[in-house]
């Protein structure tokens, strides 16, 4: 038993194990975090707003920092995001009508967290998310489902970004 404890301790410290919150990319000195509206390279309506709002909501929920919704010199750090691409591809077809019945939306984004002095605290250039959604053939009841899919992707993205910034897993 005496031999098992040091071996277990050595194994856990060697594998990168750490307590929750101890590997944060956000220093304790960051009390104010600016999150301006994400930039976009995609030709899509409202995606950057959905991603920005979801990220702000997640930061408000999971951090003690005060979140500013604009680019501010008074912030201790700034999180910039960019929507790199957004594509929608038909996934399944209705054989009777010859039209698509479901689609796959793919959104690629990157984020950069910088301290007030310009030092990079966190960077991820390769967030890729997919979401499937159904379309309707009934034009009288047509509801554009891609907005709902974008909002679901934005929520997943925000959870992943904030988790990665806070926990580095």
Which ranges hold each PLM region?
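Residues embedded in well-ordered secondary-structure elements
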Residues: 4, 24, 70, 98-100
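N-terminal start-of-chain detector that recognizes signal peptides
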Residues: 7-9, 38-40, 49-56, 78-86, ...
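Sec-dependent bacterial lipoprotein signal peptides
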Residues: 1-15
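Compositionally biased, intrinsically disordered linkers/stalks adjacent to structured regions
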Residues: 143-169
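A structural "domain/chain start" motif
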Residues: 15-64, 71, 88, 117, ...
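Conserved acidic
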Residues: 43, 47, 101, 145, ...
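Surface-exposed short loop/turn segments
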Residues: 63-66, 76-124, 130-148
